[in-house]
Amino acid sequence: MKESVLIVGAGMGLSASLAHLCKSKGMKVVLAARDIGKLKKLKKETSADTIKCDATNIKSVENLFKKTDKIIGVPNLVIYNPSKSLGGNIGDINPKKAHEAINVTCYGGFLIAQQAAKRMLKKKRGSIFFTGATASVKGFS
């Protein structure tokens, strides 16, 4: 079977570049995002499947992996790309917004990694990458 990648938190920034790179290397691409309607162009460009997923919701993540299992089996690579930008100085950041950002970047990453690792360990193969989304490569991060 062809090598495959699941990109969680897909959009038109860093994850789009990664999707194109993986496609160019012959990998089957699956894109996951809260709003898959925004992925129409990327889906077409990469021949990807898309799955709706809120990475901070246990049931949504479990559903993502059940659907991924049916489409590509256990992915060779899972990329966790969601982020939530806060901006501003630490003294000005709303604590509720900070909690939301931590939920997306940390807890969501844990949920995705847990589901991916369970499958990858059984197959004795696979990699999980965590990005900082596009914010990690721009000056405002």
Regions found by a protein language model. Give the residues of each.
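Hydrophobic positions on the long internal alpha-helix
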Residues: L64, I79, G108, I112-A116
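Catalytic loop of short-chain dehydrogenase/reductase
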Residues: S127-S141
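Conserved glycine-rich cofactor-binding loop
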Residues: G11-M12
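Catalytic Tyr-X3-Lys loop
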Residues: K84, G91-L111, F129
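A short helix-coil junction within the Rossmann-fold of NAD(P)-dependent oxidoreductases
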Residues: K25, I71-I72, G88-N89, Q115-K124
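Rossmann-fold cofactor-recognition segment
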Residues: E45-K59
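Conserved NAD(P)H cofactor-binding loop of Rossmann-fold oxidoreductase domains
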Residues: I79-G87
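Conserved glycine-rich Rossmann-like NAD(P)H-binding loop of the short-chain dehydrogenase/reductase
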Residues: M27-K40
